[in-house]
A protein has these predicted regions:
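Conserved phosphate-chemistry cores used by DNA topoisomerases
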Residues: 1-424
Length: 424
């Protein structure tokens, strides 16, 4: 009630006007209108200059908005950026508690907490979250999503909420430029530029790769090599010995799981030997359960699985434009061999972490133009798989954004070893 009264007082004081920093569009039909919620005043300025003012509205957001999962509703409404979102969209908001309540015999789900949310008053039928492609941008996007899920959920259920996809990179070779929207896009573009004239064949005929396939093979082998070196540096284990254990099948995740049998790793378990062999010089080598349970070992095992077929199918030969140029290449030498025969033209890859790094024309071309952009529609569905950690979106928001630390710690500990790209 306090939150609703606060909104009413502010609307009365402001005369029901829209936020001053909102650059509204000319279109008055909500079905033909869209609004971008843009991270940062600088990017908001570029978006205002680059937009099509006929149907695109821009609302810049300053800094990180309030985490509504931890705040009272009166605190939420007093937060300036959230108040601007509520006012700009025109729908007001619903109480989190009210939305979750069961309806009474009159169909009223809210009692004293009657929701004032009015979907019919929505001023734009596309509400687009546009944040930077970095850690801070992801955090701000999550905070905005938390607000919409808790206090404007019908926007999500009605399919009105979207996430913009700005590019991560711009690749250029000579006068040719291309916007790249993901790590895969970048890798494929590099492969196309450098390896399009190359072909890699395995001696046994099981592998025949060109272009992006060459890039993927080299990446898997490089990851494995780095992981094996990490084992030596961090755990004092010979990477070559561990690799032979993987190849023979004697050393695997199954051997770790068999010892634990579903238990949590205990102090007594850590020293238990799960595999022993000899090094090439005849020295005994033992691998304990504690070592096999470390992130370094698990990453190496995962890298081996990715590169397993490549290790089994060598040695390799390379053709360039259909002509044999080198053969008898082992997996460890393949990367250097490919570099010798790849196209040497200069490539330039520019990383775009912030929306403000693009000028108005670039922002329009990559992220705002309906003819070329990519938008992700936000949905909220229950988990389809029985082994998913979160069974409902409600549980996910509660654990990841709420006050309780213990469930969040448990989630992090459960999935820490699966992290592939950690950006801190």
């Amino acid at each position: 009630r306090k939150a609703r009264e606060m909104v009413q007082r502010k609307n009365a004081m402001e005369g029901g006007s829209l936020p001053g920093k909102l650059a509204d569009c000319q279109e008055r039909d909500p079905a033909g209108s869209e609004i971008f919620l843009v991270e940062g005043e600088s990017a908001g300025g570029s978006a205002k200059m680059g937009r099509d003012r006929k149907f695109q509205a821009i609302l810049p957001l300053k800094g990180k908005i309030l985490n509504v999962e931890k705040a009272r509703e009166d605190q939420m409404v007093s937060h300036e950026e959230i108040r601007h979102i509520i006012t700009a969209l025109g729908t007001k908001f619903h109480s989190r508690i009210a939305y979750l309540a069961e309806p009474d015999e009159n169909g009223d789900t809210n009692g004293d907490n009657v929701s004032e949310f009015d979907l019919e008053s929505l001023r734009y039928h596309k509400v687009i979250i546009m944040t930077d492609a970095d850690v801070d941008g992801s955090h701000i996007r999550t905070l905005i999503l938390t607000f919409f899920y808790r206090h404007m959920r019908p926007l999500i259920e009605g399919g009105y909420l979207y996430i913009a996809q700005p590019p991560l990179y711009k690749g250029s070779k000579g006068r040719n430029e291309e916007w790249l929207y993901s790590e895969d896009d970048k890798d494929n573009w590099v492969a196309q530029q450098r390896f399009s004239n190359l072909r890699i064949l395995s001696k046994n005929g099981a592998m025949d790769l060109v272009g992006a396939g060459v890039q993927k093979l080299l990446k898997s082998m490089q990851t494995l090599e780095t992981s094996l070196e990490d084992l030596d540096e961090k755990l004092g284990l010979s990477g070559d010995v561990v690799l032979q254990g993987f190849i023979s099948g004697e050393l695997s995740q199954a051997s770790v799981d068999e010892v634990l049998e579903g238990r949590q790793l205990s102090f007594m378990d850590e020293g238990r030997v799960i595999w022993n062999t000899q090094s090439p010089t005849g020295e005994p080598v033992e691998i304990t359960l504690g070592q096999a349970s470390t992130p370094q070992f698990q990453r190496t095992l995962s890298a081996y699985r990715e590169a397993e077929s490549a290790l089994q199918n060598g040695p390799y030969a390379i053709e360039r434009q259909g002509n044999p140029v080198e053969d008898g290449i082992g997996w460890r030498q393949l990367g250097e061999a490919v570099e010798r025969h790849a196209d040497k033209g200069s490539l330039n890859i520019q990383r775009y972490k912030g929306l403000g790094e693009m000028n108005p024309d670039q922002l329009w071309e990559t992220t705002m133009d309906p003819q070329t952009r990519t938008l992700l529609r936000v949905t909220a569905e229950e988990a389809a798989q029985a082994d998913d950690y979160f069974k409902t979106p409600d549980e996910a928001f509660s654990v990841l954004m709420g006050d309780s630390v213990a469930p969040r710690r448990e989630f992090i500990q459960t999935y820490a070893r699966q992290v592939a790209n950690l950006d801190i």
